[in-house]
């Protein structure tokens, strides 16, 4: 299986609450299906919907959907690099919109500081699965795809709603 990463940039910054109860969130399109992205991959909606449903049940609803600042070298979430917790992930057509709370962790503080200073950050999904090239040269993500995290925070955002190569592109992983 391959580590598969995708990057999207159009995220909105939201601050909720006042004073010491203030919480910072990012929100936007985290995943897209049935669309050939710029690195030639396509996630079938059936596969993506099934996996997002599993991810929501196993992680989001239980407060375990964590993401990191930057991309790590593997599919597992490293607690020492966690910057945010994904609080919602819902389907809107072929897009999956997400919302994530920036946490009061060392990496969360860095992300918060960057956002406060006006740095445009993107989000990038991370998962493992197989790729099969179709007749048109599109790499179709296989039914064995498993989402590791719906969103890591990354420094190199692409154009709005566009996928670009993740930094872990092409690395081989055994699940």
Locate the predicted segments by residue.
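Generic low-complexity segments that are intrinsically disordered, proline-rich and/or Lys/Arg-biased
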Residues: 45, 73-76, 158
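Polar/acidic, low-complexity leader/linker segments enriched in S/T/G and N/D
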Residues: 1-62
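Amphipathic interaction/junction segments at domain boundaries or subunit interfaces
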Residues: 57-76
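Residue microenvironments linked to proteolytic maturation
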Residues: 3, 12-28, 65-68, 78, ...
